[in-house]
Design a protein with these regions (language model features):
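Alpha-helical/coil-rich non-catalytic "connector" segments in signaling and regulatory proteins
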Residues: 1-194
C-alpha cells in the first residue's frame, strides 16, 4: 500500500491520547500532511494545536471492519449473543450493538467530533473511562467479550483477563485514506501557486 506510493512518511506511535501532544512536536514542517489512526487522535491534534493548517486525514474502524469481525466471531460461535458483547465504538454514541448488527441502526458517524461534546478533558479521560467499563462489565459477568476501537487499551484489557477484539480497518480502506490525504496535500499546494 504505502510502499507502492512515491512518498516519504514517518510513523509515530502513542500509548494514550495524552502522548499525542508530545509526538506532534516531532511532526516538523517537512511533513506536508498528517494521517492518524482514527478521528479521536486527529481531534486531539486539533484540540492541542488549533493553529495547525496542514491537512489531517484519518482512518477509523469502518462499518466493514466491524461486520468482518462480527462475522468471524459468529463463525467461531454460532450461538454468540450480541446482548452479551460490549462494543464501545457504537455504545459511546448511544447505538445498541444488537441494533447495529441487525441493520436497524447505522454505525455512528465519528468523522467530525464536536469540541463541545469531546473537549480536552473528556478526550484525555475517555480511554480510561472505556477501559473501566470493559473491565467492570467483564468482572460482573455481564459480557462474554468486548470490542474496542481504542487500540491503546487492548493490552491492558488483555492483562485484566477480558476477551477483547480490535476491528482492524482493511488495507484498501487505509489506502483510500492515504490517497485522500495525498490529494488534499496536492490541492493545497496548487492553491498556494494561484
Amino acid at each position: 500500500m504505502l510502499g507502492d506510493l512515491d512518498v516519504d512518511y514517518c510513523i509515530f506511535t502513542y500509548k494514550t491520547f495524552s502522548d499525542i501532544q508530545y509526538i506532534y512536536e516531532n511532526v516538523t514542517e517537512e511533513f506536508d500532511g498528517i494521517l492518524t489512526s482514527g478521528s479521536f487522535p486527529a481531534h486531539m491534534i486539533h484540540l492541542y494545536y488549533k493553529e495547525e493548517k496542514r491537512p489531517i486525514c484519518f482512518f477509523n474502524t469502518d462499518e466493514a471492519a466491524l461486520y468482518r469481525l462480527f462475522l468471524k466471531l459468529l463463525n467461531e460461535n454460532r450461538n454468540l449473543d450480541f446482548t452479551r458483547v460490549y462494543a464501545d465504538i457504537v455504545e459511546i454514541f448511544g447505538v445498541g450493538l444488537k441494533d447495529f448488527v441487525e441493520g436497524r441502526s447505522p454505525m455512528p458517524d465519528i468523522r467530525e467530533l464536536s469540541a463541545d461534546e469531546f473537549d480536552m478533558e473528556r478526550m484525555l479521560g475517555i480511554e480510561q473511562e472505556e477501559y473501566g467499563k470493559h473491565v467492570r462489565l467483564w468482572e460482573e459477568g455481564k459480557i462474554d467479550l468486548s470490542v474496542t476501537r481504542f487500540s491503546s487499551i487492548v493490552p491492558a484489557l488483555q492483562e485484566a483477563g477480558v476477551k477483547v477484539y480490535f476491528p482492524f480497518p482493511s488495507k484498501r480502506y487505509v489506502g483510500e485514506m492515504c490517497d485522500k490525504l495525498l490529494n488534499e496535500i496536492e490541492r493545497r499546494k496548487l492553491e498556494e501557486q494561484i
